[in-house]
From Swiss-Prot:
Coiled coil: none annotated. The modification Phosphothreonine is found at T111. The keyword Disulfide bond applies. This is Profilin-4.
Length: 131
């Protein structure tokens, strides 16, 4: 299966008539493996800061998680594995695998829990595959 197929079929999938606003799979080096058409244009330093938070949990808390110029307040995640952020009625979930970061961005009516399930399910599968 190609990386764009993972984004289209597994991240941008329909959940009770709703879907993520945007999604992407990005390598630890900041290279885009695949992304939805709606995924924001991000800066390399934004991805570097996210990677740093996986290595040093809590490093994003004082400044927030920034992606494509949007600032998300960092909320409880799983240190070293999942970062979650909130902005208004929406937010972001980032799951780290061995080689990539899985991004899911949502807005109402999709819930944070639904976003977490979508992103973390694919991330767990890729981890099982050694990716």
């Amino acid at each position: 299966m190609s990386w764009p197929t993972y984004v289209d079929d597994h991240l941008m999938c329909d959940i009770e008539g709703q879907h993520l606003t945007a999604a992407a799979i990005i390598g630890h080096d900041g290279s885009v493996w695949a992304q939805s058409a709606t995924f924001p244009q991000f800066k390399p330093e934004e991805v570097a800061a996210i990677i740093k938070d996986f290595d040093e949990p809590g490093s994003l808390a004082p400044t927030g998680l920034h992606l494509g110029g949007t600032k998300y307040m960092v909320i409880r995640g799983e240190p070293g594995a999942v970062i979650r952020g909130k902005k208004g009625a929406g937010g972001i979930t980032v799951k780290k695998t061995g080689q990539a970061l899985i991004f899911g961005i949502y807005d109402e009516p999709l819930t944070p829990g639904q976003c977490n399930i979508i992103v973390e399910r694919l991330g767990d599968y890729l981890l099982e595959q050694g990716l």
